[in-house]
Curated annotation (Swiss-Prot):
Highly expressed in the testis (at protein level). Residues 18-69 form the FHA domain. Regulator of sperm motility and spermatocyte meiosis. It is found in: Cell projection, Cilium, Flagellum. Residues 241-495, 646-915, 1003-1060, 1111-1140, 1256-1335 form a coiled coil. This is Forkhead-associated domain-containing protein 1. Residues 932-956, 1053-1074, 1340-1363, 1376-1420 are annotated as: Disordered. Keywords: Cell projection, Cilium, Coiled coil, Differentiation, Flagellum, Meiosis, Spermatogenesis. It comes from Mus musculus (Mouse). Transmembrane segments: none annotated.
Length: 1420
């Protein structure tokens, strides 16, 4: 009993004991990471006849039917799936002849007896080797059906394992459906014998036993029988198809016979019906008979063609079937030959397999013997040293080994030869397999061909059915046509003969009908001719008399008019005569002449009236004697000469006025320069006012200190204060009133000037933006207008071209009409000449074809041109409407702009007036200052007397002034905030206005553009004037600053003159020197100890911090706030601690200096961070002039003062260095060198450091300007890109318009092509109809010549009348053809897109019928 392990790589033969592992000595070597060196062992148990698998306690264990096993022995059954390790290959146990005792559930089905050829037999006893799939018979020989009912039953309990443990493995109870594997009679290929071999197995792994058993032979015979049955099925199918084809051929023949019979019956009926009509020469019946004959011929041709095609296809199918039969027989023969070859090859293979197995057994025996001999040699080698005789034995053994090795080499060479032969056999098998595949493909192709033939036969049957349906329809149409003809004939008889029949017994023939119609038409013609002659005779006599009388009247009046025109007459005389001419009662023939003469006279009358009006307008009175057109012209010439002389005088006056204007302009410029100087003075006054406000703010702190001092002084010396109170009160009131008035005036002026400046700046910005927008809009409008002009020019060119084409077409139509007239004349001449009728008729027909075609083309083109003209007119109207609407909109906008410009001019005028007022006010102030200077020398003595009373007075004044200034500052800040809100609102309004203006771009006309350009020029002039005014204002501010400096110098001189005679001057020199050294500039921020002042300072600093740029501006703001809070806390502590008067005074003076220094440092830092920020005002802070200073100050206080000053300097410098570092890091400036502190430096070094800091500031300014320029460039680039985008959008719109126009033109071209095709078809039809008419005319002529005598013809009617009738009928025919052709063209236009050609054919057929009904009247 042989067993195998089946895997994807092939088959492995199991020995009685097979070792599995990674080691090289193991039987089945598996080299993977999951497998141990000695993994497992499979042994055959002869007692039970089963295989047992034992795991050697491997790391990952083994899996039997996906059940994990480790250090356990398990019995195996055929079909068990094994896997060694967790991720190894799967193996299936396959046993050739399982023992029935040990494994009753694996028992296969009993072999089928011989008389059952169609059922599967028992599994064969074929020996398997590497590469063979050991499957059961149900797998190898099945044909797509599931296994029989004798497959293994439901799951069962496995027997006990070798180690005494029980393991149950579940089998799949469902029998799998096995696919068809058999392809040929051979059992050796990969698909014919095994169903489990993978596609990757090479064919070199197939081996067979030497002798086949009887079962195998029976199975092969059964398979061959199945193939024979399959081929017989194919034969039956082919016979069935042959029978079907024969039946179809018979049906086709029957159908063809029926068709021929029906056609013969229809022809007989039509001949029976048409015999009496042919005797009466009915042209319509002849046409129908011809059409029916043509249809018959077409049907016969189709039948013949169809029968021929059927016969050809049947013959081809017969030949194909015969060839297929022959091929099937050849295949059977080849199959028999190949089956014999396969059996012989199988026998050879089995014999060679047995030889190989014998050789393998011998090799195994030799291996065992070699092992035994090796053991013996080892024993001998141990004894070798002792006995020399054993050496001889070893030599003999060596000789034997060499002989054995030679034998092994021979065996190996034989094995190689056998393998080569096996490969050759496999190649032959492959070739046979390929041939069988080719044969199967050919069979499939033949099946496909048969299916196609069946489909063709079905299609042809359907076509035959359609042909039958068409014949039925044709029959129905013929019957309807016959009925319509009969009805039409009856109606004609009723119309000609009336209700009573002339021959009651006999039917009316066609000849009688035709003769009656001819008589009726002749009577009508004669009657109409008589009518015309009588009417002409009656109308001619009275008309001639009337015309003669009216002509005489006209002549008389015209002579009068001529006499009047020759004489010098006025317009009134001419008018009277024209009215007489107009109201003359004349005949209608002469009325046209009358109208033309009246029009000519009216033109001359209008000229005369206009000249008289001109003379009347010029106040030139004409006398009664002076009349006539020539005299009026002479008067006009004289007046013109007078006017020319007056115009020359006026030009001289204009030149003089221009010179005066130039002088006035120069004066105006001089006045403007004066105004500029005044503005400079105003600016100086502003600076002075700012200095005063700063002084007040600086003195507020000293005022608070002086309050406390004054209270102490009042307690000590109340008597002195009571005496001086009255004097102080009077002085206070006077000073307060004067200061309050000055403050109010200055505030109002400052506010007015600020507002003016802001308004001017806003107006300038608005005007600049408006001008930019206007220029941009103008450019856009120019582009759009140019495009519209081009379009209009294109349209005009097209219109002119179309007009030219229309004129050409009209000329062609006139030519064609002339040709038609000529053709009619030629027809009348041709009718007189009977011999040349046929030739001339043909020439006329050709000419008529050409004329008809040209007329139709011209008509269609005229219609198209009319439509286009209408569309263009509509588009032009729409464009005009749009332009008018745009004009109205632009006019409204222009009026708005004009109003704005007027408002701006009014504001400028008002500003100039205010400037004049301000200059006058400043002049008054200058006068007061000069008076004060003159009066300085006088009150020096009074000042020396009032020294004692001075300090308290000054302190009270300062307190009041500081309170007023604080209130003013608060009010100014509130007003500034409100103005900022207004400015933001105005900016939003400006943005909305810009958006509206951008919407209106591209909609302006040329006139509006011109107006906008004028307005832009005006705006530019105004902006230039404003810039000039600003320059003048700047000059005035410069002058004002100079005057402020002079005032400061004068005030210092006054103070010095007042302070010289005071006794305590020596004591006050030290703080003064200190204050003079620290001349500090800072913003107006009152250093009041109250909470309101601190809040105001914090708010101003926070505003500055928001404005400053950089990533670390918040940190700097926080640092500044902390420093200010520390300073304030220290100031308050010092104020509380120091109670003594002298100490208080010293500390307060020093604190003032320290706070001023700290604020100066803070201000410098803020200026470094944001130098563009505008400061409200700068003041010089000086120590209080009248504060008492004690000479007995101690050294301790001086030390404390020095330490405080050093701390303040350190804080300020830290803030400065931090700010410089942040700016340098943000701006990427590496050359910042002013990082040293000023604490321990000498004055010279401090100057150097200050110089370096200024350089750093210049670098920062340069960097900021560079960034600004870059931003401006980027903005300009963005604007350019936006303009390009808008241009692209406009170009896209124009491209879309052009595309639509191109599409329209293409549609027009297609329409013209379709119309040409329709016209060609109509021409072809008319040609056919004309040829038919010629034939009918010839037949009629022959019949008349045969049936009628020449005498009767001369008696019945004259040839001249016949010619007239023929001519009229011919014209009617031409008209009817034209109408029908136009109807057909319309119908084809509607149906060409849908592709329905049948309707057009039917219409053509109907048109021919209508023409045939008209034709009988036109016989010769």
């Amino acid at each position: 009993m042989k067993a195998y392990l089946k895997s994807a790589d092939g088959f492995f033969v199991l020995n009685k004991s097979t070792t599995i592992g990674k080691h090289a000595d193991s039987d089945l070597v598996l080299q993977s990471a999951d497998i141990d060196n000695h993994h497992a062992l499979i042994e055959f148990n002869e007692a039970e006849g089963t295989f047992v698998l034992q795991d050697f306690n491997s790391r990952n264990g083994t899996f039997v039917n996906e059940c994990h096993i480790q250090n356990v022995a398990v019995k195996l059954i055929p079909g068990d799936i094994l896997r060694f390790g967790s991720a190894g290959m799967t193996y299936e146990l396959v046993i050739e002849n399982p023992s029935p005792v040990s494994c009753p559930w694996v028992r296969g089905p009993a072999p089928w007896p011989s008389p059952q050829p169609h059922l599967s037999s028992s599994p064969p006893d074929m020996p398997f080797h590497h590469g063979i799939q050991p499957a059961t018979v149900q797998r190898s020989w099945s044909q797509g059906c599931p296994r029989p009912t004798m497959v293994p039953p439901a799951p069962h309990q496995r027997p006990m394992s070798a180690s005494g443990k029980m393991f149950s493995f579940v089998m799949d109870p469902k029998s799998p459906v096995i696919n068809q594997v058999w392809a040929n009679a051979m059992d050796m290929s990969e698909q014919c014998m095994m169903d489990g071999l993978s596609g990757t197995i090479p064919p070199t792994e197939i081996f067979m036993d030497h002798d086949l058993s009887q079962q195998d032979k029976d199975e092969i015979i059964l398979l061959l029988g199945r193939e024979v049955n399959r081929l017989s099925d194919f034969e039956m199918e082919s016979k069935y198809k042959d029978a079907l084809i024969m039946n179809l051929q018979a049906e086709v023949a029957d159908l063809s016979q029926r068709l021929s019979e029906t056609a013969a019956v229809a022809a007989a009926r039509q001949s029976n019906r048409c015999d009496p009509k042919l005797q009466g020469v009915d042209e319509g019946d002849d046409l129908r008979q011809k059409e029916i004959e043509s249809m018959k011929s077409q049907i016969n041709a189709l039948q013949k063609g169809y029968s021929q095609v059927l016969s050809q296809t049947l013959a081809e199918r017969n030949t194909e079937i015969e060839s297929l039969k022959n091929e099937g027989e050849n295949l059977k023969r080849d199959h028999a030959i190949t089956s014999g070859m396969v059996t012989s090859l199988q026998k050879d293979m089995s014999a060679r397999n047995e030889q190989v197995q014998q050789l393998q057994e011998e090799v195994n025996r030799l291996r065992i013997e070699n092992r035994e001999k090796e053991y013996q040699l080892e024993a001998l080698s141990s004894r070798c040293s002792v006995m020399k005789e054993e050496l001889r034995k070893e030599e003999a053994q060596k000789d034997r080994r060499e002989a054995q090795e030679k034998e092994l080499k021979l065996c190996r060479s034989q094995m190689q030869d056998m393998e080569k032969e096996v490969r050759k056999l496999r190649e032959e098998l492959k070739k046979n397999y390929m041939g069988q595949n080719i044969i199967s493909k050919t069979l499939r192709e033949k099946n496909k061909v048969e299916e196609k033939l069946q489909e063709d036969s079905r299609r042809k049957l359907l076509q035959l059915q359609e042909m039958g349906n068409r014949e039925n329809l044709i029959k129905i149409n013929l019957e309807r046509a016959v009925g319509q003809l009969e009805n039409f004939r009856n109606q004609v008889i009723k119309a000609t003969f009336g209700k009573t029949k002339p021959f009651r017994d006999k039917p009316i023939t066609d000849q009688q009908l035709i003769e009656k119609i001819i008589q009726v038409t002749e009577d009508n013609l004669s009657f109409q001719q008589r009518k015309w002659t009588l009417q002409r005779e009656t109308h001619l006599h009275p008309k001639q008399e009337e015309t003669m009388h009216s002509v005489e009247k006209l002549r008389v009046l015209l002579d009068k008019c001529q006499a009047c025109m020759r004489d010098s007459c006025s317009s009134i005389d001419l008018k009277k005569e024209v009215e007489l001419l107009q109201h003359l009662p004349l005949s209608p023939l002469v009325s046209g002449l009358q109208k033309t003469v009246v029009n000519i006279l009216r033109v001359s009358l209008s000229w005369l009236e206009e000249t008289e009006q001109l003379l009347g307008d010029l106040d030139i009175e004409l006398s009664d004697s002076d009349k006539g057109f020539s005299l009026c012209l002479i008067y006009l010439l004289e007046h013109y000469k007078k006017i020319m002389s007056q115009s020359q005088d006026l030009q001289a006056q204009m030149n003089a006025s221009r010179e005066t204007q130039k002088s006035l302009r120069q004066e105006h410029l001089a006045e403007k320069e004066k105004l500029a100087e005044k503005l400079e003075q105003e600016e100086k006054l502003k600076a002075k006012i700012q200095q005063l406000t700063e002084e007040k703010a600086a003195l507020e702190e000293s005022i608070g200190q002086e309050k406390s001092r004054s209270e102490e002084a009042l307690e000590k010396a109340q008597a002195r204060v009571r005496e001086l109170e009255n004097h102080l009160a009077s002085q206070k009131e006077a000073l307060e009133n004067s200061v309050a008035q000055e403050k109010r005036k200055m505030r109002e002026m400052l506010e007015a000037e600020r507002r003016k400046a802001q308004d001017l700046e806003n107006q300038l910005t608005q005007q600049k933006e408006i001008s930019e927008n206007n220029t941009y809009e103008k450019l856009k409008m120019r582009d759009t207008l140019e495009k519209e002009k081009r379009k209009i020019q294109d349209l005009e060119n097209r219109l002119t071209k179309q007009k030219e084409e229309i004129e050409l077409k009209e000329q062609k139509e006139n030519v064609l009409n002339n040709k038609l007239k000529d053709a009619l004349v030629m027809v009348e001449d041709a009718q007189q000449m009977k011999t040349t009728e046929s030739q001339r008729a043909e020439t006329l027909a050709l000419k008529l074809k050409e004329t008809l075609a040209e007329l139709e083309t011209t008509k269609t083109k005229m219609i198209l041109t009319d439509d286009r003209l209408k569309l263009q007119q509509q588009s032009m109207k729409a464009l005009q409407d749009e332009r008018e609407s745009q004009k109205h909109g632009f006019e409204e906008e222009i009026s708005e702009y004009k109003e704005q410009i007027k408002q701006h001019s009014q504001t400028i005028v008002s500003l100039e007036e205010r400037l004049c007022q301000v200059t006058q006010y400043y002049q008054k102030i200058e006068g007061e200052i000069t008076t004060l200077k003159n009066n300085d020398t006088g009150p020096k003595e009074e000042a020396s007397q009032d020294l004692t009373a001075g300090p308290p007075l000054d302190s009270g004044d300062k307190e009041i002034a500081c309170d007023h200034l604080i209130d003013d500052l608060l009010m100014a800040q509130k007003e500034i905030l409100s103005q900022q809100e207004i400015i933001m609102k105005l900016r939003t309004d400006l943005g909305e206005a810009h958006s509206r203006m951008s919407d209106l771009r591209g909609e302006l006309s040329e006139k509006q553009k011109m107006e906008l350009e004028r307005q832009v020029a005006l705006v530019r002039q105004q902006s230039g004037e404003l810039s000039m005014l600003k320059a003048k204002v700047a000059q005035t501010t410069g002058l004002m600053e100079k005057k402020d400096r002079e005032l400061k110098v004068l005030r210092e001189a006054l103070r010095a003159s007042q302070e010289k005679p005071r006794p305590h001057l020596s004591t006050e020199q030290k703080p003064r020197t200190l204050s003079q050294k620290c001349d500090i500039s800072l913003q107006i921020e009152p250093a009041h100890p109250d909470s309101f002042s601190s809040f105001q300072e914090e708010q101003s600093f926070s505003d500055l911090g928001v404005k400053c740029k950089g990533s670390r501006h918040e940190e700097t703001i926080q640092r500044q706030r902390k420093a200010l809070s520390e300073l304030r806390t220290r100031v308050r502590e010092l104020e509380k601690a120091n109670s003594c008067n002298h100490k208080d005074h010293v500390n307060e003076s020093f604190l003032e200096l320290r706070t001023l220094r700290m604020e100066k440092n803070v201000q410098k830092i803020l200026l470094d961070a944001k130098p563009d920020l505008t400061t409200l005002a700068r003041v010089e802070i000086r120590p209080p002039q009248n504060s008492p200073f004690n000479s007995g100050s101690t050294l301790v206080m001086e030390k404390s003062v020095k330490t405080d000053a050093g701390e303040a300097l350190e804080l300020s410098e830290k803030l400065y260095t931090d700010m410089i570092k942040t700016l340098g890091s943000l701006m990427n400036i590496k050359d910042m060198s002013s990082h040293t502190s000023l604490k321990h430096l000498s004055p010279k070094e401090r100057e150097k450091v200050n110089h370096l800091r200024q350089k750093d500031l210049d670098l920062v300014f340069d960097k900021i300007t560079q960034l600004k320029t870059r931003l401006q460039r980027k903005e300009e680039l963005l604007k350019g890109y936006e303009q390009e985008l808008e241009q692209l959008r406009h170009s896209k719109v124009s491209v879309q318009m052009y595309q639509t126009q191109v599409a329209k033109l293409e549609d027009d071209v297609h329409k013209e092509a379709e119309e040409k095709a329709l016209l060609k078809e109509a021409l072809e039809r008319t040609e056919q109809q004309l040829s038919q008419e010629r034939r009918f005319n010839r037949v009629f002529k022959q019949q008349k010549d045969r049936g009628e005598d020449p005498e009767q013809r001369n008696m019945s009617y004259s040839p001249f009348k016949d010619n007239e009738k023929q001519r009229r009928l011919f014209v009617e025919m031409v008209k009817s053809k034209m109408q029908n052709s136009s109807v057909q063209a319309g119908a084809k236009k509607a149906t060409l897109k849908t592709g329905q050609e049948r309707e057009t054919k039917k219409e053509a057929y109907k048109s021919t019928q209508s023409l045939s009904f008209v034709k009988p009247g036109g016989k010769n």
